[in-house]
Amino acid sequence: MMLPQGYTFRKLKLTDYDNQYLETLKVLTTVGEISKEDFTELYNHWSSLPSIYHPYVITNASGIVVATGMLFVEKKLIHECGKVGHIEDISVAKSEQGKKLGYYLVTSLTKVAQENDCYKVILDCSPENVGFYEKCGYKDGGVEMVCRF
């Protein structure tokens, strides 16, 4: 599948703070107030660990972030010190939904996980999103348990 004309899938850039990155992420969940300084600090942390953090975005022809996603690669002792990919923070701007950007994002992050030698990729989702992730090639692999603080 290809992106619509004018759209680009790429790694997150520091300048995306000013290109609607946080606003797009807010479609998914509560983000809170994140200053440019806070964003820069987190971006630099992610950039210092490129084998672990793989933040990606989809931008429109104007360079505005319209979809977000993160692949986090966890190094394990099991599976001969194998790696597991975790897909997180999939969010598509409301005005861009229905264009298969989420599908493109998830399948592209899955490929990034394969390229990073992950033996599997996992993600958590709400029950109403199960059908979407099944279309992306995922299947029910268990139950997510949470302890929030």
From Swiss-Prot:
Family (UniProt): Belongs to the acetyltransferase family. GNA1 subfamily.
InterPro entries: Acyl_CoA_acyltransferase, GNAT_dom, GNPNAT1-like
Keywords of this entry: Acyltransferase, Transferase
Pfam families attached to this UniProt entry: Acetyltransf_1
Protein name: Glucosamine 6-phosphate N-acetyltransferase
Domain N-acetyltransferase residues, every copy: 7-149
EC number: 2.3.1.4
Any one GO biological process: UDP-N-acetylglucosamine biosynthetic process
Any GO MF annotation of the entry: glucosamine 6-phosphate N-acetyltransferase activity
One GO CC term on file: fungal biofilm matrix
Enzyme class: transferase
Binding-site residues, acetyl-CoA: I90, S91, V92, G98, K99, K100, L101, G102, Y103, Y133, E134, K135
Reaction(s) catalysed by this chain's protein: D-glucosamine 6-phosphate + acetyl-CoA = N-acetyl-D-glucosamine 6-phosphate + CoA + H(+)
Record: residues binding substrate: T29, K76, L77, I78, H79, E88, D89, I90, Y119, K120, D124, R148
Key word Transferase present: yes
Pathway: Nucleotide-sugar biosynthesis; UDP-N-acetyl-alpha-D-glucosamine biosynthesis; N-acetyl-alpha-D-glucosamine 1-phosphate from alpha-D-glucosamine 6-phosphate (route I): step 1/2
Record has Transferase as a keyword: yes
